[in-house]
Protein backbone atom coordinates (compact mmCIF):
# COMPACT_ATOMS: atom_id res chain seq x y z
CA UNK A 1 0.00 0.00 0.00
CA UNK A 2 1.25 3.48 -0.88
CA UNK A 3 -0.06 6.51 1.01
CA UNK A 4 0.04 10.04 -0.37
CA UNK A 5 1.60 12.05 2.46
CA UNK A 6 2.04 15.31 0.57
CA UNK A 7 1.13 18.08 3.01
CA UNK A 8 -0.14 15.64 5.65
CA UNK A 9 0.75 15.87 9.35
CA UNK A 10 2.83 13.01 10.74
CA UNK A 11 4.20 12.39 14.23
CA UNK A 12 7.51 10.69 15.03
CA UNK A 13 8.13 9.83 18.68
CA UNK A 14 11.84 9.47 19.35
CA UNK A 15 14.86 11.58 18.48
CA UNK A 16 17.64 9.08 17.82
CA UNK A 17 19.33 7.87 14.65
CA UNK A 18 16.43 5.59 13.70
CA UNK A 19 13.94 8.42 14.17
CA UNK A 20 16.12 10.66 12.00
CA UNK A 21 15.95 8.13 9.14
CA UNK A 22 12.17 7.89 9.45
CA UNK A 23 11.82 11.69 9.52
CA UNK A 24 14.01 12.06 6.44
CA UNK A 25 11.87 9.54 4.55
CA UNK A 26 8.65 11.31 5.55
CA UNK A 27 10.00 14.71 4.51
CA UNK A 28 10.98 13.25 1.14
CA UNK A 29 7.33 12.24 0.75
CA UNK A 30 6.26 15.84 1.35
CA UNK A 31 4.86 15.26 4.84
CA UNK A 32 4.69 17.86 7.62
CA UNK A 33 6.51 16.17 10.48
CA UNK A 34 6.45 16.76 14.22
CA UNK A 35 9.15 15.04 16.28
CA UNK A 36 8.88 14.52 20.03
CA UNK A 37 11.92 13.16 21.84
CA UNK A 38 14.71 14.00 24.23
CA UNK A 39 18.23 14.90 23.07
CA UNK A 40 17.75 14.99 19.28
CA UNK A 41 20.77 13.52 17.49
CA UNK A 42 22.77 15.81 15.15
CA UNK A 43 21.45 13.95 12.09
CA UNK A 44 17.96 14.99 13.12
CA UNK A 45 18.90 18.57 13.90
CA UNK A 46 20.50 18.91 10.47
CA UNK A 47 17.21 18.14 8.75
CA UNK A 48 16.29 21.79 8.39
CA UNK A 49 12.86 22.16 6.83
CA UNK A 50 9.83 24.39 7.16
CA UNK A 51 7.87 21.13 7.31
CA UNK A 52 9.71 19.89 10.42
CA UNK A 53 8.96 20.74 14.06
CA UNK A 54 11.15 19.28 16.83
CA UNK A 55 9.96 19.19 20.45
CA UNK A 56 13.02 18.17 22.47
CA UNK A 57 11.30 16.59 25.47
CA UNK A 58 9.57 13.45 26.68
CA UNK A 59 6.47 12.23 24.88
CA UNK A 60 3.10 13.09 26.44
CA UNK A 61 -0.30 11.66 25.61
CA UNK A 62 -1.38 15.22 24.85
CA UNK A 63 1.06 15.18 21.91
CA UNK A 64 -1.36 12.95 20.06
CA UNK A 65 -3.31 15.12 17.68
CA UNK A 66 -4.98 14.82 14.30
CA UNK A 67 -2.16 13.07 12.48
CA UNK A 68 -2.36 11.00 9.32
CA UNK A 69 0.41 8.69 10.48
CA UNK A 70 2.45 8.00 13.62
CA UNK A 71 5.87 6.38 14.02
CA UNK A 72 7.26 5.20 17.35
CA UNK A 73 11.07 5.07 17.26
CA UNK A 74 12.23 5.09 20.88
CA UNK A 75 14.25 2.51 22.82
CA UNK A 76 11.64 2.59 25.61
CA UNK A 77 9.12 -0.24 25.23
CA UNK A 78 6.66 1.44 27.61
CA UNK A 79 6.63 4.64 25.55
CA UNK A 80 6.32 2.64 22.34
CA UNK A 81 3.33 0.71 23.67
CA UNK A 82 1.70 3.96 24.77
CA UNK A 83 2.23 5.48 21.33
CA UNK A 84 0.73 2.37 19.74
CA UNK A 85 -2.27 2.28 22.07
CA UNK A 86 -3.07 5.99 21.76
CA UNK A 87 -2.76 5.87 17.97
CA UNK A 88 -5.05 2.86 17.69
CA UNK A 89 -7.65 4.52 19.94
CA UNK A 90 -7.75 7.42 17.50
CA UNK A 91 -7.75 5.27 14.38
CA UNK A 92 -4.36 6.59 13.25
CA UNK A 93 -2.05 4.23 11.33
CA UNK A 94 0.97 3.54 13.56
CA UNK A 95 4.33 1.88 13.06
CA UNK A 96 6.49 0.96 16.03
CA UNK A 97 9.94 0.38 14.58
CA UNK A 98 10.96 -3.30 14.66
CA UNK A 99 7.86 -4.25 16.71
CA UNK A 100 5.27 -5.48 14.19
CA UNK A 101 2.86 -6.70 16.88
CA UNK A 102 2.48 -3.09 18.09
CA UNK A 103 2.07 -1.74 14.54
CA UNK A 104 -0.89 -1.42 12.21
CA UNK A 105 1.42 -1.13 9.20
CA UNK A 106 5.00 -2.05 8.35
CA UNK A 107 7.42 0.26 6.58
CA UNK A 108 9.31 -1.61 3.85
CA UNK A 109 12.87 -0.94 2.78
CA UNK A 110 12.46 1.20 -0.34
CA UNK A 111 14.80 1.67 -3.27
CA UNK A 112 14.06 4.87 -5.20
CA UNK A 113 15.31 6.11 -8.53
CA UNK A 114 13.26 9.08 -9.68
CA UNK A 115 9.65 7.89 -9.98
CA UNK A 116 10.70 4.25 -9.68
CA UNK A 117 10.15 2.85 -6.19
CA UNK A 118 10.78 -0.79 -5.27
CA UNK A 119 9.64 -1.82 -1.80
CA UNK A 120 11.09 -4.81 0.07
CA UNK A 121 9.35 -6.22 3.14
CA UNK A 122 9.93 -9.28 5.29
CA UNK A 123 6.68 -8.77 7.18
CA UNK A 124 8.63 -7.34 10.08
CA UNK A 125 10.59 -10.58 10.53
CA UNK A 126 13.99 -9.20 9.51
CA UNK A 127 14.43 -5.51 8.68
CA UNK A 128 18.16 -6.18 8.28
CA UNK A 129 17.49 -8.69 5.51
CA UNK A 130 15.12 -6.24 3.83
CA UNK A 131 17.83 -3.58 3.88
CA UNK A 132 20.39 -5.99 2.42
CA UNK A 133 18.05 -6.91 -0.44
CA UNK A 134 17.35 -3.22 -1.04
CA UNK A 135 21.10 -2.56 -1.28
CA UNK A 136 21.41 -5.30 -3.90
CA UNK A 137 18.55 -3.74 -5.86
CA UNK A 138 20.30 -0.37 -5.72
CA UNK A 139 23.24 -1.90 -7.57
CA UNK A 140 21.00 -3.42 -10.25
CA UNK A 141 18.47 -0.66 -10.82
CA UNK A 142 20.43 2.54 -11.36
CA UNK A 143 19.69 5.99 -12.69
CA UNK A 144 19.07 4.75 -16.23
CA UNK A 145 15.88 3.12 -14.99
CA UNK A 146 14.70 6.49 -13.66
CA UNK A 147 15.34 8.00 -17.10
CA UNK A 148 13.33 5.21 -18.74
CA UNK A 149 10.39 5.62 -16.35
CA UNK A 150 10.37 9.39 -16.88
CA UNK A 151 10.39 8.94 -20.66
CA UNK A 152 7.55 6.42 -20.56
CA UNK A 153 5.57 8.80 -18.36
CA UNK A 154 6.18 11.67 -20.77
CA UNK A 155 4.50 9.65 -23.55
CA UNK A 156 1.64 8.24 -21.46
CA UNK A 157 -0.91 10.87 -22.46
CA UNK A 158 0.03 10.47 -26.12
CA UNK A 159 -0.54 6.72 -25.83
CA UNK A 160 -3.89 7.21 -24.06
CA UNK A 161 -5.08 9.61 -26.75
CA UNK A 162 -3.84 7.76 -29.82
CA UNK A 163 -4.44 4.11 -28.94
CA UNK A 164 -7.98 2.96 -28.05
CA UNK A 165 -8.61 0.13 -25.62
CA UNK A 166 -6.73 -1.01 -22.55
CA UNK A 167 -5.52 -4.24 -24.15
CA UNK A 168 -4.04 -2.52 -27.18
CA UNK A 169 -2.28 0.01 -24.99
CA UNK A 170 -0.94 -2.71 -22.70
CA UNK A 171 0.35 -4.62 -25.73
CA UNK A 172 1.99 -1.45 -27.06
CA UNK A 173 3.76 -0.75 -23.77
CA UNK A 174 4.96 -4.35 -23.64
CA UNK A 175 6.21 -4.04 -27.21
CA UNK A 176 8.18 -0.92 -26.31
CA UNK A 177 9.91 -2.66 -23.42
CA UNK A 178 10.46 -5.86 -25.40
CA UNK A 179 12.07 -3.78 -28.16
CA UNK A 180 14.86 -2.92 -25.74
CA UNK A 181 14.04 0.64 -24.72
CA UNK A 182 16.49 0.52 -21.83
CA UNK A 183 19.32 -0.62 -24.08
CA UNK A 184 18.52 2.09 -26.63
CA UNK A 185 18.66 4.73 -23.90
CA UNK A 186 22.00 3.42 -22.66
CA UNK A 187 23.61 3.30 -26.10
CA UNK A 188 21.95 6.12 -28.04
CA UNK A 189 20.35 8.40 -25.48
CA UNK A 190 16.94 9.88 -24.78
CA UNK A 191 16.07 11.14 -28.32
CA UNK A 192 16.49 7.63 -29.75
CA UNK A 193 14.40 6.19 -26.92
CA UNK A 194 11.63 8.72 -27.56
CA UNK A 195 11.67 7.86 -31.26
CA UNK A 196 11.25 4.16 -30.45
CA UNK A 197 8.26 4.89 -28.23
CA UNK A 198 6.59 7.08 -30.85
CA UNK A 199 7.03 4.40 -33.53
CA UNK A 200 5.24 1.88 -31.36
CA UNK A 201 2.46 4.33 -30.52
CA UNK A 202 1.86 5.07 -34.21
CA UNK A 203 1.83 1.38 -35.05
CA UNK A 204 -0.59 0.58 -32.22
CA UNK A 205 -2.86 3.46 -33.26
CA UNK A 206 -3.02 1.99 -36.77
CA UNK A 207 -3.62 -1.51 -35.45
CA UNK A 208 -0.23 -2.75 -36.60
CA UNK A 209 2.85 -4.19 -34.96
CA UNK A 210 6.38 -2.82 -35.21
Give, region by region, the residue ranges found by the protein language model.
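Residue-level detector of alpha-helix initiation sites
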Residues: 17-18, 78, 124
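An accessory alpha-helical subdomain
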Residues: 124-210
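E1/E1-like adenylate-forming module used to activate ubiquitin-like modifiers
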Residues: 96-146
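Short loop/edge segments at beta-strand edges and connector loops
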Residues: 37, 54-58, 98
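Hydrophobic, well-ordered beta-alpha structural blocks that scaffold small-molecule cofactor pockets
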Residues: 1-39, 44-47
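ADP-ribose/adenylate-binding Rossmann-like module
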Residues: 69-75, 80-107
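Glycine-rich, highly charged phosphate/nucleotide-binding loops
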Residues: 48-65
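Hydrophobic beta-strand scaffold residues
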Residues: 33, 54, 93-94
Amino acid sequence: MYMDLEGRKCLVVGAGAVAARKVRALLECGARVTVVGEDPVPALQRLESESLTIRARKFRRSDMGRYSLVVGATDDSVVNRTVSRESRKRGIPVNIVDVPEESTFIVPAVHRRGDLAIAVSTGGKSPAAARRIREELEERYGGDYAVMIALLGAHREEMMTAVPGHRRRAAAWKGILDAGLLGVLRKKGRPAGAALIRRHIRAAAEGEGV
